[in-house]
């Protein structure tokens, strides 16, 4: 597992497994961190509390985990042909970034601040692009942390963006070119 500490509040962990067998992953955390886990390819299994809880993430899925009363160190497995990224960010840093949006992010609201939070999501093509940019960065050490911090902020902004007004014509990841043609024709009418 490749771990990069951006500062005391942000840690990125990446792991790829293109071997022919499962790869163990282990992350020590502390109670102050919100965990974001992203499976870009293959499958990852995340075990918590001596395997009492287990989350399986398939390709292009993610999960947010936060438990204000219990530390959540990770004991997991990365299946073969898999790519995984975790982002650990302190609740203090996260709350500082989103303080104006606490009403829009359910686990930051006053009534939920002391509650466990677990939520699975699908990774959008835009988020997948940012995740791959983080994983594949090849910058010199003097600008690496600045670049990665910017990408983390971009990732979080996209992750919590509630807008559904994406311009489908400009989406470079649109799987079906026929849909783009149909949309263009409909706009012309």
Feature locations, PLM:
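Extended serine/threonine-enriched, polar tracts that run as long, contiguous segments within proteins
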Residues: 134-137, 155
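A short mid-domain helix/strand-loop element embedded in enzyme catalytic domains
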Residues: 94-97, 101-131
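Short, Lys/Arg-enriched, Trp-marked, Pro/Gly-tolerant hinge/linker segments that flank
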Residues: 109-122, 138-147, 158-188
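N-terminal regulatory/effector-sensing and dimerization cores
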Residues: 2-105
């Amino acid at each position: 597992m490749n771990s990069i500490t951006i500062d005391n509040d942000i840690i990125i962990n990446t792991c790829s497994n293109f071997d022919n067998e499962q790869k163990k992953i282990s992350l020590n955390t502390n109670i102050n961190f919100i965990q974001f886990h992203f499976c870009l390819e293959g499958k990852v299994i995340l075990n918590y509390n001596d395997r009492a809880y287990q989350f399986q993430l398939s390709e292009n899925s993610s999960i947010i985990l936060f438990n204000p009363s219990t530390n959540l160190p990770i004991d997991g497995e990365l299946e073969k042909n898999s790519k995984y990224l975790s982002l650990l960010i302190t609740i203090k840093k996260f709350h500082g970034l989103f303080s104006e949006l606490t009403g829009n992010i359910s686990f930051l609201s006053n009534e939920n601040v002391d509650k466990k939070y677990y939520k699975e999501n699908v990774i959008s093509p835009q988020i997948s692009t940012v995740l791959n940019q983080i994983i594949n960065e090849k910058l010199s050490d003097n600008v690496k942390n600045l670049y990665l911090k910017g990408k983390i902020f971009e990732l979080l902004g996209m992750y919590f963006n509630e807008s559904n007004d994406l311009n489908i014509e400009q989406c470079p990841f649109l799987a079906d070119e026929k849909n783009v043609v149909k949309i263009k024709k409909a706009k012309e009418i």
